[in-house]
Amino acid sequence: MKKKFFLSAILISLFGLAAAKPVQADTTVADIQKRGELVVGVKQDVPNFGYKDPKTGTYSGIETDLAKMVADELKVKVRYVPVTAQTRGPLLDNEQVDMDIATFTITDERKKLYNFTSPYYTDASGFLVNKSAKIKNIEDLNGKTIGVAQGSITQRLITELGTKKGLKFKFVELGSYPELITSLHAHRIDAFSVDRSILSGYISKRTELLDDSFKPSDYGIVTKKSNTDLNNYLDNLVTKWSKDGSLQKLYDRYKLKPSSHTAD
């Protein structure tokens, strides 16, 4: 069953761009309400954030729940469009989703291309390794191969960290988290690196999460750069939910503990 799910996840990632239906360019809040449907790009392979059950087809996670909360505020239905780190930007650019809520890290470079709301979650990056490899810290990864997701900033962050510590790494980029965890289990890579909360969903009897973490970063809801109307509306919602405890309820629901700060 797991193999079928992994294959399904890969196929949906490849064909997601073609399958998604276009939405109106620079969709306003009023447009969405008139349409009666909010179209949101979400992950489908990240437990606790955006995960699609292969048996029932239902989504769960703080990000899919957050999308539903936005839809409830607008009094419309929500439609989830599965995305990856590779496809979430193009789908937004091509007006096939209204927004992305998909572990999209806020960076200065990305803010030149897209609008981001205030952060709804802060997480640090880490490493998942096979227990049998006896890897205990980042120094043990010197010269080894680290798997990262295509389209993510993880490789750059690890390289910067390695430069500071005098370490060098090899990298393999893969299109989805199921591909990465499969490669780790098969010992084709020595470690799988992404945000720690994402990695926590893939811990098993065979794997463990290293204590080492690096570069805490913020996730934001993403809209097109030109769509200030929708971004302002969403930012107000995130700010409100941060203050009234709604975001904390989401963290508690999925047993998540955000990092308390963002690294310099």
Walk through the language-model features, giving the residues of each:
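Periplasmic-binding protein-like
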Residues: 122-129, 196-239, 257-264
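Beta->alpha turn/N-cap motifs
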Residues: 42-46, 81-86, 95-107, 151-152, ...
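Acidic, polar ligand-binding/catalytic clefts
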Residues: 68, 72, 77-140, 207, ...
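A ligand-binding cleft/hinge motif common to bilobed small-molecule-binding domains
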Residues: 104-112, 157-162, 182-215
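Ligand-binding clefts/hinges and TM-proximal coupling segments of bilobed small-molecule sensing domains
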Residues: 26-28, 154-172, 204-213, 239-264
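Bilobed "Venus flytrap"/periplasmic-binding protein-like clamshell domains
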Residues: 39-47, 59-72, 104-105, 126-176, ...
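Extracytoplasmic small-molecule ligand-binding "clamshell" domains
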Residues: 25-102
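Extended ligand-binding regions for polar small-molecule ligands
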Residues: 64-73, 135, 139-140, 144, ...
